[in-house]
Amino acid sequence: MIGRLRGILAYKQPPWLVIDVGGVGYELEAPMSTFYDLPDVGRDVILFTHYAQKEDSVSLYGFLREGERRLFRDVQKVTGIGAKIALAVLSGVTVDEFARLITSGDITALTRIPGIGKKTAERMVVELRDRAADFSSGAPITGQLGPDAISEATVALQQLGYKPAEAARMARDAGAEGGEVATVIRKALQAALR
């Protein structure tokens, strides 16, 4: 299948991006952890990918770091968890933070990630605890400048499963000091986990 793509970033709007590889545009869904570090549109990018085929759809997911792709795949092995929740995990916490939450059994923090309830968090801890030490992240998080960071962050938070009013409040609170889109989103998600 498709394991990696190298091309020009043609489009990015969370959670979607398009990479032009030899004139073919590959549409991928990606977690916010990937969006934080993406280059500007028109620049070269290399993404690790996960190809998923269901009865009625085909999906391609993109990750800047191999550790994120590995975590995405491992989280989906937990009973009752699919791609949407796996993306929410990677959008809500770093790979290292997730490993710490699993190792320590922090159910409360896990339930703050959209789509994860108490029972799902407990299942995750039980089923992933042995593999948590193998999770590895990569480079530090950086962002992209945007003309309206709060507006873009609100849209991104809605795509992650937050209700419109809640997403707007989170983005407003996190963006009070201004800053890049990725910074506003990261601050909002970190505040939600507290």
Curated annotation (Swiss-Prot):
GO cellular component terms, alphabetically, are:
cytoplasm; Holliday junction helicase complex; Holliday junction resolvase complex
Positions of region (Domain I): 1-64
Flexible linker: annotated segments:
140-144
The segments labelled Domain II in the record are 65-140
Keywords linked to the UniProt accession? Cytoplasm, DNA damage, DNA recombination, DNA repair, DNA-binding
Q: Mind telling me which Gene3D superfamilies this protein's record contains? A: 5' to 3' exonuclease, C-terminal subdomain, DNA helicase RuvA subunit, C-terminal domain, Nucleic acid-binding proteins
Q: Name one GO biological process term.
A: DNA repair
**Region named Domain III:** 145-194
Q: Name one GO molecular function term.
A: ATP binding
Q: What is its main location?
A: cytoplasm
Q: Which Pfam families match?
A: HHH_5, RuvA_C, RuvA_N
Its annotated compartments are: Cytoplasm
Q: Which family does it belong to?
A: Belongs to the RuvA family.
Subunit-structure text? Homotetramer. Forms an RuvA(8)-RuvB(12)-Holliday junction (HJ) complex. HJ DNA is sandwiched between 2 RuvA tetramers; dsDNA enters through RuvA and exits via RuvB. An RuvB hexamer assembles on each DNA strand where it exits the tetramer. Each RuvB hexamer is contacted by two RuvA subunits (via domain III) on 2 adjacent RuvB subunits; this complex drives branch migration. In the full resolvosome a probable DNA-RuvA(4)-RuvB(12)-RuvC(2) complex forms which resolves the HJ.
UniProt note: domains:
Has three domains with a flexible linker between the domains II and III and assumes an 'L' shape. Domain III is highly mobile and contacts RuvB.
HAMAP family registered for this protein in UniProt: DNA_HJ_migration_RuvA
Role noted for this protein:
The RuvA-RuvB-RuvC complex processes Holliday junction (HJ) DNA during genetic recombination and DNA repair, while the RuvA-RuvB complex plays an important role in the rescue of blocked DNA replication forks via replication fork reversal (RFR). RuvA specifically binds to HJ cruciform DNA, conferring on it an open structure. The RuvB hexamer acts as an ATP-dependent pump, pulling dsDNA into and through the RuvAB complex. HJ branch migration allows RuvC to scan DNA until it finds its consensus sequence, where it cleaves and resolves the cruciform DNA.
Q: What is the protein's name according to its record?
A: Holliday junction branch migration complex subunit RuvA
Q: Which organism is it from?
A: Xanthomonas oryzae pv. oryzae (strain KACC10331 / KXO85)
